[in-house]
Structure formats: structure tokens, C-alpha cells
Swiss-Prot record:
The keyword Acetylation does not apply. GO terms for biological process: translation. GO terms for molecular function: structural constituent of ribosome. PANTHER family: 50S RIBOSOMAL PROTEIN L33, CHLOROPLASTIC, LARGE RIBOSOMAL SUBUNIT PROTEIN BL33C. The gene is rpmG3. SUPFAM superfamilies: Zn-binding ribosomal proteins (SSF57829). Keywords: Ribonucleoprotein, Ribosomal protein. GO terms for cellular component: cytoplasm; ribonucleoprotein complex; ribosome. InterPro entries: Ribosomal_bL33, Ribosomal_bL33_CS, Ribosomal_bL33_sf, Ribosomal_zn-bd. Pfam families: Ribosomal_L33. It comes from Bacillus pumilus (strain SAFR-032). This is Large ribosomal subunit protein bL33C.
């Protein structure tokens, strides 16, 4: 079952990305390095509720 999740920047708190994940294979929170337009660099983005 795939669900939509929002990824928020850990440095600015901006919610920059929306993606999907499979809850069965990835039950924990997703963390990805993505581009932050405000900081103009790649930062860690975490899954929000």
C-alpha cells in the first residue's frame, strides 16, 4: 500500500517535496538529501506526519 508523504527540510522547516512510499517495506520515517530552494544547497529532508 503506497501512501503520500511530505518531506520537510531539517534546516528551514519548509515542506518542499511530496512523494509516495510503501509502508510495508519502509515502516520508519524516510530521510533523503534533497535540494532546498531557500538555502540554494542540498540538505536533509525528513518525512512529516
Amino acid at each position: 500500500m503506497r501512501v503520500k508523504i511530505t518531506l520537510a527540510c531539517t534546516e528551514t522547516g519548509d515542506r518542499n517535496y511530496i512523494t509516495t512510499k510503501n509502508k510495508r517495506t519502509n515502516p520508519d520515517r524516510l530521510e533523503l538529501k534533497k535540494y532546498s530552494p531557500r538555502l540554494k544547497k542540498y540538505t536533509l529532508h525528513r518525512e512529516t506526519k
